Amino acid sequence: MSGDVVARDHQWFEEALCEAVSLFTLKQLASSWEHSPPYPHWKDYAPAFREYAERLSGEQHRYLPLGKSVAGWYAENREVLGSSPYLREKNEFLATQLTALLEKAPGSLGAIGYLNLERSSFSKSFEAYLESWYSCCPEDIRDFAMRVISLFTRGDHDGTAAAAVTVSGGPPY
């Protein structure tokens, strides 16, 4: 690679985060524009945003088979993700899991801005990369990073193994 482009072992995760934010934003726009569009004649776009988000969210490759966890999925796909970060179906699968986390705590979207603050985190293991992200986040938005870590280590969405909620088998809504 040349110029300012940095090869990252965890680019696949960034791709999934971008897709998650896109899906989350589509859903937010649908809700917001339904009641308060920026211009009155734009209100008609709300259902189109919602339908598009639902169509994307409903794609079967975005969901785990019942009984599997994200942690298990990651263990099976770790090598291929690191070597080929643009595998759309794998990125979209993870994006759906991350979107579920964002929907539970919409105020934590700002945590994404703290990813990659430590330049040395690019070459760390994925676990250390996530821990670096967590430590860079201000305390009031660290919860999102912790939930992501929990997703990869235990497979749950809420940060506690006892109350694991894995988005499996189909759309969560």
Predicted regions and their residues:
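Second-shell loop/turn segments in exported
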Residues: 3-12, 84-85
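Post-HExxH zinc-binding segment in Zn-dependent metallohydrolases
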Residues: 9-58
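Pan-zinc metallopeptidase signature
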Residues: 59-173
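Catalytic glutamate of the conserved HExxH
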Residues: 1-4, 20
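Active-site catalytic microenvironments for nucleophilic, acid-base chemistry
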Residues: 4, 24-28, 101-104
